């Protein structure tokens, strides 16, 4: 089973300009969560245990988003806003280990994925595109189908 996923998020986001001028495209909100969070949650739901972000120094907000913010946690706890606290620091994030690798020069998708080589340790891995967002009213079913697809590929492609 695949346990690691690579999320290439270092790109400049030129197709999303002017919206991506100040906010990384992966952090643009869809309803109440940034786009990249949907990809991370889907990965966790199909059993991914490690997520490797290929990022750039300008995209520090992605790393900040997946960290627990102690100041916010204290304020929300003190004011009794526990539901909001759960949204700010989802428990699901504790089920996965996050890695951040800087891609100093953007030389395409293949180059971005290659930046994760040391963390992948010759294991099978998934590549997730955080800007591809499909919302599904039956998320468990989609996760199940994606999980079933991998053994099929192994069997038929002798990967």
Regions flagged by a language model, labelled:
Residues 133-159:
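Conserved donor-nucleotide/metal-binding helix-loop-beta segment in metal-dependent transferases, i.e.
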Residues 27, 98-100, 159:
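Conserved beta-strand scaffold positions in the cores of enzyme catalytic domains, especially
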Residues 22-37:
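Short catalytic helix/loop segments, enriched in acidic residues and glycine
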Residues 22, 69-72, 146:
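A glycine- and small-aliphatic-rich helix-loop capping segment at beta-alpha/alpha-beta transitions
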Residues 1-7, 15, 33-123, 139:
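Conserved N-terminal catalytic core of the sugar/cofactor nucleotidyltransferase
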Residues 12, 23, 58:
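A generic "binding-loop/recognition-motif" signal
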Residues 122-133:
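Short beta-strand-to-loop acidic/aromatic patch adjacent to the donor-nucleotide binding site
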Residues 10, 56, 130:
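Cofactor-binding loop segments of dinucleotide-utilizing enzymes, especially the Rossmann-like FAD-
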């Amino acid at each position: 089973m695949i346990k690691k996923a690579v999320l290439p998020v270092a790109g400049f986001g030129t197709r999303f300009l002017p919206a991506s001028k100040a906010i990384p495209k992966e952090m643009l909100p869809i309803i109440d969560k940034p786009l990249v969070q949907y990809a991370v949650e889907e990965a966790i739901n199909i059993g991914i245990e490690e997520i490797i972000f290929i990022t750039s120094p300008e995209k520090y907000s992605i790393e900040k988003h997946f960290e627990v913010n102690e100041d916010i946690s204290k304020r929300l706890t003190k004011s009794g806003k526990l539901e909001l606290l759960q949204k700010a620091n989802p428990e699901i994030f504790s089920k996965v280990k996050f890695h951040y690798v800087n891609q100093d020069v953007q030389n395409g998708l293949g180059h971005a994925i290659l930046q994760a080589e040391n963390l992948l340790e010759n294991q099978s891995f998934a590549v997730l595109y955080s800007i591809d967002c499909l919302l599904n009213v039956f998320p468990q079913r989609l996760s199940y189908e994606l999980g079933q697809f991998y053994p099929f590929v192994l069997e038929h492609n002798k990967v």
